Amino acid sequence: MKKKTTSLGMKLVAFLAMLMLFCIPVSAGVKETAGEYEISPTPQEITYGDKEMQLTDQVKLSIGSDIDDYTKTRITDTLNVLKLTGNESAASDKTELIVGVYGSGDAADTYGKANGAVQATFDNYDAYMLNVKDGKIVVLGKDTDAAFYGVTTLKRIFEQLSADKKIKELTVTDYAEV
């Protein structure tokens, strides 16, 4: 009887050990390398430039007319992460945040098309492009919901910045895979 109990106990221990192997978290997706931002969920593509951009405490806002109130609130929340103040009349030497919709003809659409936005990307569900370069941060969404997701990605990046408020030049392209 004692031998049977030991055998059953060993099987139970072996089973639990195997079960624990499947409970260990596994990292999936793109691994960040040193100096890259951690963005979750992982975007379709991130391209980093060679420079960093200094954010100013005052941010000039240019928000397209197709952007809804929820996205405008997300913009304010994003700026608040670094205690930045946004307004439409900030001086031209300030960081500029431009948010708009692809195909609308607004400032974000014009900038995006001149800086790599392609129709094929925006044929996808919830597609957006986030571009940080030359004193400008541009979020161009397929629609206002996609622009919201782009601003949310910017918020995640802002949460990782140090007190010096320097952000790497980059382009993020993302869309949902359904």
Model-inferred region functions:
Residues 1-8:
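N-terminal secretory signal peptides that target proteins for export/translocation
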Residues 8-28:
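Sec-dependent N-terminal signal peptides of Gram-positive bacterial secreted proteins and lipoproteins
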Residues 28-178:
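Acidic, contiguous N-terminal accessory segments
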